[in-house]
Regions:
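Extracytosolic ligand-binding ectodomains
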Residues: 1-209
Length: 209
Protein backbone atom coordinates (compact mmCIF):
# COMPACT_ATOMS: atom_id res chain seq x y z
CA UNK A 1 0.00 0.00 0.00
CA UNK A 2 1.27 3.45 -0.93
CA UNK A 3 0.19 6.03 1.67
CA UNK A 4 -0.03 9.29 -0.26
CA UNK A 5 -0.24 12.60 1.59
CA UNK A 6 -0.07 14.63 -1.64
CA UNK A 7 3.42 15.96 -0.94
CA UNK A 8 5.71 16.72 -3.87
CA UNK A 9 7.46 13.34 -3.96
CA UNK A 10 6.53 12.37 -7.50
CA UNK A 11 9.69 10.47 -8.49
CA UNK A 12 9.61 8.32 -5.35
CA UNK A 13 5.88 7.68 -5.77
CA UNK A 14 6.08 6.80 -9.47
CA UNK A 15 9.18 4.67 -8.88
CA UNK A 16 7.35 2.33 -6.53
CA UNK A 17 4.36 2.11 -8.86
CA UNK A 18 6.68 1.15 -11.73
CA UNK A 19 8.41 -1.56 -9.66
CA UNK A 20 5.05 -2.99 -8.57
CA UNK A 21 3.81 -3.15 -12.17
CA UNK A 22 7.03 -4.76 -13.41
CA UNK A 23 6.82 -7.46 -10.75
CA UNK A 24 3.10 -8.01 -11.05
CA UNK A 25 2.59 -7.02 -7.42
CA UNK A 26 -0.81 -5.80 -6.28
CA UNK A 27 -0.81 -2.36 -4.71
CA UNK A 28 -3.33 0.20 -3.58
CA UNK A 29 -2.93 3.94 -3.08
CA UNK A 30 -4.40 5.14 0.22
CA UNK A 31 -5.03 8.82 0.92
CA UNK A 32 -3.44 9.90 4.19
CA UNK A 33 -6.51 12.05 4.83
CA UNK A 34 -8.81 9.03 4.56
CA UNK A 35 -7.05 6.40 6.63
CA UNK A 36 -10.22 4.34 7.07
CA UNK A 37 -9.26 3.01 3.63
CA UNK A 38 -6.15 1.55 5.24
CA UNK A 39 -8.20 -0.65 7.55
CA UNK A 40 -10.40 -1.81 4.69
CA UNK A 41 -7.40 -2.59 2.47
CA UNK A 42 -5.59 -4.88 4.93
CA UNK A 43 -5.08 -8.50 3.94
CA UNK A 44 -5.20 -11.29 6.54
CA UNK A 45 -3.62 -13.80 4.14
CA UNK A 46 -0.52 -12.00 2.85
CA UNK A 47 2.00 -9.50 4.20
CA UNK A 48 0.91 -5.86 4.06
CA UNK A 49 3.76 -3.51 3.09
CA UNK A 50 2.92 0.12 3.84
CA UNK A 51 5.07 2.75 2.10
CA UNK A 52 4.45 6.37 3.16
CA UNK A 53 5.27 8.71 0.31
CA UNK A 54 6.29 11.42 2.78
CA UNK A 55 9.28 10.73 5.08
CA UNK A 56 8.03 13.12 7.78
CA UNK A 57 7.64 12.21 11.45
CA UNK A 58 4.10 13.63 11.38
CA UNK A 59 3.02 11.17 8.68
CA UNK A 60 4.77 8.26 10.43
CA UNK A 61 3.08 9.12 13.74
CA UNK A 62 -0.32 9.36 12.06
CA UNK A 63 0.10 5.95 10.43
CA UNK A 64 1.24 4.31 13.66
CA UNK A 65 -1.71 5.75 15.57
CA UNK A 66 -4.10 4.39 12.94
CA UNK A 67 -2.49 0.94 13.00
CA UNK A 68 -2.48 0.86 16.81
CA UNK A 69 -6.21 1.60 16.86
CA UNK A 70 -7.06 -1.14 14.37
CA UNK A 71 -8.76 -4.26 15.67
CA UNK A 72 -7.08 -7.65 15.21
CA UNK A 73 -3.73 -6.16 14.22
CA UNK A 74 -2.00 -9.12 15.90
CA UNK A 75 -3.34 -11.38 13.16
CA UNK A 76 -2.23 -9.05 10.34
CA UNK A 77 1.36 -9.13 9.10
CA UNK A 78 2.57 -5.56 8.58
CA UNK A 79 5.85 -4.09 7.35
CA UNK A 80 6.44 -0.35 6.99
CA UNK A 81 9.06 0.86 4.51
CA UNK A 82 10.54 4.34 4.73
CA UNK A 83 13.39 6.67 3.87
CA UNK A 84 16.71 7.63 5.45
CA UNK A 85 15.45 10.40 7.72
CA UNK A 86 13.36 7.89 9.68
CA UNK A 87 16.53 7.41 11.73
CA UNK A 88 16.04 10.93 13.10
CA UNK A 89 13.07 9.72 15.15
CA UNK A 90 13.66 5.95 15.38
CA UNK A 91 14.64 6.28 19.05
CA UNK A 92 11.39 8.07 19.89
CA UNK A 93 9.26 5.40 18.19
CA UNK A 94 11.42 2.35 18.92
CA UNK A 95 8.41 0.29 20.00
CA UNK A 96 6.52 1.07 16.79
CA UNK A 97 9.60 0.38 14.66
CA UNK A 98 9.77 -3.10 16.18
CA UNK A 99 6.03 -3.78 16.24
CA UNK A 100 5.57 -2.96 12.55
CA UNK A 101 8.83 -4.42 11.21
CA UNK A 102 10.00 -1.02 10.00
CA UNK A 103 12.63 -0.97 7.27
CA UNK A 104 14.32 2.07 5.76
CA UNK A 105 17.11 2.64 3.27
CA UNK A 106 19.97 5.07 3.67
CA UNK A 107 23.51 5.90 2.63
CA UNK A 108 24.41 6.07 6.32
CA UNK A 109 23.23 5.05 9.79
CA UNK A 110 23.99 7.09 12.88
CA UNK A 111 23.24 4.99 15.97
CA UNK A 112 24.26 6.81 19.18
CA UNK A 113 23.90 3.52 21.12
CA UNK A 114 26.58 1.83 19.02
CA UNK A 115 29.64 1.31 21.25
CA UNK A 116 32.15 2.51 18.66
CA UNK A 117 30.17 5.67 17.92
CA UNK A 118 29.63 6.36 21.64
CA UNK A 119 33.40 6.09 22.18
CA UNK A 120 34.04 8.43 19.22
CA UNK A 121 31.62 10.96 20.71
CA UNK A 122 33.47 10.94 24.05
CA UNK A 123 36.85 11.35 22.37
CA UNK A 124 35.50 14.17 20.19
CA UNK A 125 34.24 16.05 23.25
CA UNK A 126 37.53 15.58 25.12
CA UNK A 127 39.57 16.83 22.18
CA UNK A 128 37.40 19.76 21.07
CA UNK A 129 35.60 20.64 24.31
CA UNK A 130 32.10 20.39 22.84
CA UNK A 131 29.58 17.96 21.40
CA UNK A 132 29.37 17.32 17.69
CA UNK A 133 26.96 19.49 15.72
CA UNK A 134 23.69 17.57 15.51
CA UNK A 135 22.98 16.67 11.91
CA UNK A 136 22.13 13.66 9.77
CA UNK A 137 24.61 12.38 8.81
CA UNK A 138 26.94 13.40 11.64
CA UNK A 139 29.71 15.18 9.79
CA UNK A 140 32.40 14.46 12.37
CA UNK A 141 31.77 10.71 12.07
CA UNK A 142 31.52 10.98 8.29
CA UNK A 143 34.89 12.75 8.17
CA UNK A 144 36.40 9.96 10.24
CA UNK A 145 34.97 7.26 7.94
CA UNK A 146 36.22 9.05 4.83
CA UNK A 147 39.63 9.75 6.32
CA UNK A 148 40.17 6.14 7.41
CA UNK A 149 38.94 4.86 4.05
CA UNK A 150 41.35 6.89 1.93
CA UNK A 151 44.30 6.62 4.34
CA UNK A 152 43.95 2.83 4.45
CA UNK A 153 43.60 2.71 0.65
CA UNK A 154 46.76 4.81 0.27
CA UNK A 155 48.59 2.62 2.78
CA UNK A 156 47.62 -0.51 0.85
CA UNK A 157 48.00 0.64 -2.77
CA UNK A 158 50.32 3.65 -2.62
CA UNK A 159 50.03 6.82 -4.70
CA UNK A 160 47.92 5.09 -7.40
CA UNK A 161 45.30 4.03 -4.84
CA UNK A 162 42.47 5.69 -6.81
CA UNK A 163 42.89 3.05 -9.54
CA UNK A 164 42.18 0.27 -7.04
CA UNK A 165 39.23 1.59 -5.06
CA UNK A 166 36.80 -0.78 -6.80
CA UNK A 167 38.79 -3.60 -5.12
CA UNK A 168 38.93 -1.99 -1.70
CA UNK A 169 36.58 -1.82 1.28
CA UNK A 170 37.12 -0.45 4.77
CA UNK A 171 35.44 -0.66 8.17
CA UNK A 172 33.08 2.19 8.96
CA UNK A 173 31.10 3.62 11.85
CA UNK A 174 28.33 5.47 10.02
CA UNK A 175 28.80 5.49 6.24
CA UNK A 176 29.65 2.36 4.20
CA UNK A 177 31.95 3.29 1.30
CA UNK A 178 32.62 1.59 -2.01
CA UNK A 179 33.74 3.88 -4.81
CA UNK A 180 33.43 3.14 -8.51
CA UNK A 181 34.37 5.25 -11.52
CA UNK A 182 31.41 5.67 -13.87
CA UNK A 183 33.63 6.30 -16.89
CA UNK A 184 37.30 6.96 -17.65
CA UNK A 185 36.86 10.74 -17.54
CA UNK A 186 34.48 10.91 -14.60
CA UNK A 187 34.92 11.06 -10.86
CA UNK A 188 34.33 8.37 -8.26
CA UNK A 189 30.85 7.60 -6.93
CA UNK A 190 29.97 5.86 -3.66
CA UNK A 191 27.56 3.09 -4.66
CA UNK A 192 26.84 1.67 -1.23
CA UNK A 193 23.30 1.73 0.20
CA UNK A 194 22.15 0.27 3.51
CA UNK A 195 18.80 -1.30 4.44
CA UNK A 196 18.00 -1.23 8.16
CA UNK A 197 15.27 -3.57 9.40
CA UNK A 198 13.73 -3.71 12.87
CA UNK A 199 12.36 -7.06 14.02
CA UNK A 200 9.46 -7.71 16.38
CA UNK A 201 11.91 -9.59 18.63
CA UNK A 202 14.00 -6.43 19.16
CA UNK A 203 16.71 -7.17 16.60
CA UNK A 204 18.10 -4.59 14.19
CA UNK A 205 19.43 -6.03 10.93
CA UNK A 206 21.68 -4.05 8.58
CA UNK A 207 22.22 -5.17 5.01
CA UNK A 208 24.64 -3.32 2.74
CA UNK A 209 24.44 -3.41 -1.06
Amino acid sequence: MLANDRTDNTLYFEGFKKIALERGAHYKIVDMNALDELRESMSFETENVIIPMSPSEKVFSKLVKTLDNMERTDSVKITMFGQSNWQQFMGKYKGAFQKYNCTFFSKFLYDPLDEEIASFQLNFKRRFGREQYQSYPMYGVMGYDLGMYFLNAYNQFGKDYADYLSEFESRFMQTPLYFERKNKDGGLVNNRVMFVKFGTNGTVEKKIY
